[in-house]
């Protein structure tokens, strides 16, 4: 049977991205474990997890979704209650929608991800951004949060309904003083969300220890899961609001539209969970931070400056410099991407030469050394 010509570009599509070394901050924490790859095939059908479902996703005993959501996950993220969502942005919106009314204010850091702002806009909130310090640090300080909250009070006559802290931010990998900021928010009577999309699943993280009332995490970004999938954490004080059930469909939680991640998404998260727990132990994370700092030093030795926290405390880093940009002016703007692709190194976006961000999570010192040797060889090739 001949196939419609317009359909031939669909069907199975092979990925041609080089993946011997992956430095893409969006991808390093979401690389599937071998167990998750098996789960992807076993549970890939849309409603596969619903073979023995009684009407509530989080109550499914076979597979052990109930134990994961109600026992393992709250302990792992350090919160009283947890839910699996369709991503960190969905977690943030669910919290905002449950906790606020249209026209309320939310204060969030100036390094916040765009999805935090869009989630607030979807909830019909006014957004006050906390200024970051100037280059090269781009820090978020408790004092700046206090000033922003005071400005909202003066403008609206009351404190903001919510605050949000990005921990770490997705541009520079900065880890703000979360405990000081959450304490300050609470002094003003403001509950606070910690967006841990680049923390939960990558590094040690306990929301209550940081003073969070709510947390949002990303499975496909940081928990070795197939997306879209995320996590939401809430403490007992606000659980009734965020986890409220429908008055007409009494086993369905309103903010999650009943059920969220099904099939491959939640099952790959569960399959990777033992490995994720292991890699977030302090001793494992210390090695990751050591590798990131080593790589930062090596990059600075060739003329690229690392921005943000120094010494750095996260795998995500932002670099800027002219060494590759100057070469691009003599060749073309895509030369760096092309040269790295030939060595099967992925992660720096095509066309970026003057500034770019990358992640060293899980790459290891040997492969990071290979990346540095490759970058040095590229410089010699064009400037030698």
Swiss-Prot record:
Listed GO biological process terms: translation
Keyword Protein biosynthesis: yes
Record field: catalytic activity: O-phospho-L-seryl-tRNA(Cys) + hydrogen sulfide + H(+) = L-cysteinyl-tRNA(Cys) + phosphate
CC cofactor: pyridoxal 5'-phosphate
Class of the enzyme per the UniProt entry, highest EC level: transferase
EC numbers for this chain: 2.5.1.73
GO MF annotations, alphabetized: Sep-tRNA:Cys-tRNA synthase activity
Keywords: Protein biosynthesis, Pyridoxal phosphate, Transferase
Keyword Kinase set for record: no
Record function comment: Converts O-phospho-L-seryl-tRNA(Cys) (Sep-tRNA(Cys)) to L-cysteinyl-tRNA(Cys) (Cys-tRNA(Cys)).
NCBIfam families (alphabetical): PRK09331.1, SepCysS
Family recorded in the similarity comment: Belongs to the SepCysS family.
This protein's name: O-phospho-L-seryl-tRNA:Cys-tRNA synthase 1
Biological source species: Methanocella arvoryzae (strain DSM 22066 / NBRC 105507 / MRE50)
């Amino acid at each position: 049977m001949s196939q419609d010509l317009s359909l031939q570009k669909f069907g199975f599509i092979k990925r041609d991205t080089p993946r011997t070394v992956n430095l893409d901050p969006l991808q390093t924490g979401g690389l599937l474990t071998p167990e998750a790859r098996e789960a992807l095939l076993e549970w890939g059908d849309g409603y596969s997890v619903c073979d023995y479902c009684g009407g509530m996703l989080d109550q499914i005993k076979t597979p052990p979704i109930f134990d994961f959501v109600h026992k393992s996950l709250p302990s792992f993220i350090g919160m009283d209650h947890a839910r699996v969502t369709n991503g960190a942005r969905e977690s943030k919106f669910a919290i905002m929608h449950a906790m606020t009314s249209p026209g309320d204010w939310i204060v969030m850091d100036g390094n916040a991800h765009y999805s935090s702002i869009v989630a607030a806009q979807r909830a019909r909130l006014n957004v006050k951004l906390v200024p970051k310090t100037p280059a090269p640090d781009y820090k978020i300080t408790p004092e700046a949060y206090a000033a922003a909250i005071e400005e909202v009070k003066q403008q609206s006559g009351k404190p903001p309904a919510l605050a949000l802290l990005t921990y770490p931010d997705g541009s520079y990998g900065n880890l703000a003083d979360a405990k000081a900021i959450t304490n300050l928010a609470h002094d003003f009577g403001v509950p606070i969300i910690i967006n841990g999309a680049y923390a939960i699943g990558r590094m040690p993280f306990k929301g209550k220890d940081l003073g969070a009332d709510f947390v949002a995490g990303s499975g496909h970004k940081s928990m070795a899961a197939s997306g879209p999938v995320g996590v939401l954490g809430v403490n007992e004080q606000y659980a009734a609001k965020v986890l409220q059930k429908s008055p007409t469909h009494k086993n369905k939680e309103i903010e999650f539209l009943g059920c969220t991640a099904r099939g491959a998404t939640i099952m790959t998260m569960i399959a990777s969970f033992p490995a994720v727990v292991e890699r977030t132990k302090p001793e494992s994370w210390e090695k990751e931070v050591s590798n990131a700092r080593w790589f930062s030093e090596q990059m600075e030795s060739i003329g690229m400056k690392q921005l943000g926290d120094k010494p750095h405390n996260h795998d995500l880093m932002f670099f800027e410099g002219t060494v590759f940009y100057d070469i691009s002016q003599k060749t073309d703007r895509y030369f760096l991407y092309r040269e790295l692709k030939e060595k099967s190194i992925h992660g720096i976006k095509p066309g970026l030469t003057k500034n770019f961000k990358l992640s060293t999570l899980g790459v290891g010192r040997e492969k990071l050394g290979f990346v540095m040797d490759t970058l040095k060889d590229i410089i010699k090739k064009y400037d030698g």
